[in-house]
Amino acid sequence: MNLLHLADLHLGKRVNGFDLLPDQRYILEQVLDLCAAHNVQAVALAGDIYDTALPPAAAVLLLDWFLTELAHRNIPVLAIAGNHDSAERLDYAAGLLSNQQVYLAGQFTSAPRRVILQDEFGELTFDLLPFVRPATVRHCLPDADIRDEDSAIAAALGPLPTAGERRVLIAHQMVLGGGSLPTCSGSESVAADVNVGTVQAVDAARFTGYLYTALGHIHRPQQVGCPTVRYAGSPLCYSLDESGAQKSAVLVHIGANGAEPELLPLRPLHAMRHLTGPLNQLTAADTVTAVSYTHLRAHETSAHL
C-alpha cells in the first residue's frame, strides 16, 4: 500500500495577521496531485487538522472540500484529533463519514480506533490514537498504572502488534527517540515546555512492532529513533524560525513485512521570509511589494511595526 502521511494542517491559521487559507488550499491541491502521481491508496492525517477548537467557517469548508475530493478518488482517509482540535467536534458524523471511507478518531475512550483496509498483501490494520493526556487515560482506564505520559500511552495502546501482524499507528504526541527530544519550532504549543525542560514525552520504543508510526505534533519533518517512526511536519511554515525550510509529505511504501518512507517536497504559494535592515529600507515600496510574508526588524529601537 502507498500511504500518504500528513499532519499539522492547522486549517484556519493566521500568521502575523495574514490569512493562510489560500496558501492552505494551494498545498492541499498539491496533495491531490501527489495522490494521483504516486498511486496513493490511503491518506493519514495525524492531528491538528484545525488551528483552533473553534475554527472559522472557511476552514471547515476547506476540509470538507479536501475530504470530498479524496472520497471522489476512492482514497480512504484516516484522521485523528490533535491538541489544537476539538475532539468532540471532530467526532461529529464520524459514523456516517465511515461509509465514505473517512475514518475519524476524535475522543479517546478506552483504546485506539481500529480500521482494517485491504491491499495486495492482505489486511492492513490502522490504530488511530488521538491526542490524549495522562488524566484522560486514567479516567478511561481506571485500573491501569499511569505514572506519566509514557506509561499513559503504553496503556492507551494496549497490546502491541505480534509477529506477522501488519499494523500502522497514527498518533499525535511528543515522542523521544534514543532519549532525545525531536527538533521543535516556534509555531508549536510545546515549544515553550521544551525550552524550560518541563515537557513530558513518550519513548519511541513503545511503538515496537508497528510497520510504521505516523506522528503529528512537531512541525519540522523528522524521524524519531528509526526511519519508520516519523513526524510528517506541517505542510507550510507557520513560524519565522521555519522560514526557508523545505516542507514535505511522506509517501510510505508499505509491504508485506515492512515500510519505506519517502519525502515528497511541497511548494508553498508564498515563501515566508525574515528580513533585517534599516527601517526606511524595509518599508520602501519595492521591498514591501516583493515580499509576501515578512518579519521586519528595525534598527530604530523606538519603531513600532
Predicted regions and their residues:
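Divalent metal-coordination and catalytic microenvironments
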Residues: 8, 48, 82, 126, ...
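Hydrophobic anchor at the start of a short beta-strand
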Residues: 77, 167, 261
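N-terminal active-site segment of His-dependent metallophosphoesterases
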Residues: 1-68, 72
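Conserved small/polar residues in nucleotide/adenosyl-binding loops
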Residues: 294-304
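His/Asp/Glu-rich metal-coordinating catalytic cores
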Residues: 55, 84-226
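Short, surface-exposed connector motifs at secondary-structure boundaries
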Residues: 71-79, 292
